[in-house]
UniProtKB/Swiss-Prot annotation:
Residue ranges of the TM segments: none
Alphabetical list of PANTHER family matching this protein: ASIALOGLYCOPROTEIN RECEPTOR 1-LIKE-RELATED (PTHR46490:SF6), C-TYPE LECTIN DOMAIN FAMILY 12 MEMBER A-RELATED (PTHR46490)
Assembly with partners or alone: Homohexamer; disulfide-linked.
Annotated protein name in UniProt: Lectin BRA-2
Organism of derivation: Megabalanus rosa (Acorn barnacle)
Entry-linked Gene3D superfamilies: Mannose-Binding Protein A, subunit A
Length: 173
């Protein structure tokens, strides 16, 4: 009986099998990633439209609810109508779209920040457009802005607790 021979070398199947598994897992993950990216794109694409009953203007939607509310409550009402909505930030083009939506006074998203001595939009956007009536703003206790119902449809400062119609806005992306 002699010394036993060494067994023949075993092929490196474990490494090969592991490599195949990693390659297959990577391919599956790549496919899943593509599906998820498509779902995200479709989801956001689906949100890039105005809800029924809202007026479309360029990249914005506008709506004047039937109820009247204080300026602050109006914020919440807009958000309940659509999570993307807030009181409207009005520029020159928007003014022409918004005016016919109500024949009554309506809050817009502009208020006076006394701490910074500046008028600010509810969405923190900046616009040089102002449509103040000649004598406005005229009262330091009136910190919120509305479009007046008169023939001029210009802006007036009013007490934020007063209840008026209001215009909500959604900015489409």
């Amino acid at each position: 009986y002699g010394v036993p021979e060494e067994p023949p070398p075993v092929p490196d199947t474990c490494g090969h099998v592991a490599e195949e598994r990693v390659t297959q897992a990577f391919a599956e993950l790549t496919t899943k990633l593509s599906e998820l990216q498509e779902n995200v794109t479709n989801t956001f694409h689906g949100c890039n439209h105005c809800p029924n009953g809202w007026v479309t203007s360029e990249n914005k939607c506008f709506h004047v609810p039937l109820e009247k509310a204080s300026w602050m409550v109006a914020h919440g009402v807009c958000a309940r109508l659509d999570s993307r909505a807030r009181l409207a930030s009005i520029d020159a083009a928007d003014q022409a779209v918004v005016e016919p939506l109500s024949s009554e006074k309506m809050w817009i998203g502009l208020s006076y920040d006394s701490a910074n001595d500046a008028a600010v939009w509810a969405d923190d956007s900046h616009s040089s457009h102002r449509n103040w009536y000649a004598t406005q703003p005229d009262d330091e206790s009136e910190l919120c802005v509305l479009i007046k119902e008169d023939q001029y449809r210009q802006w007036h400062d009013y007490n934020c607790n007063d209840r008026y119609n209001f215009v909500c806005e959604i900015v489409l992306h």
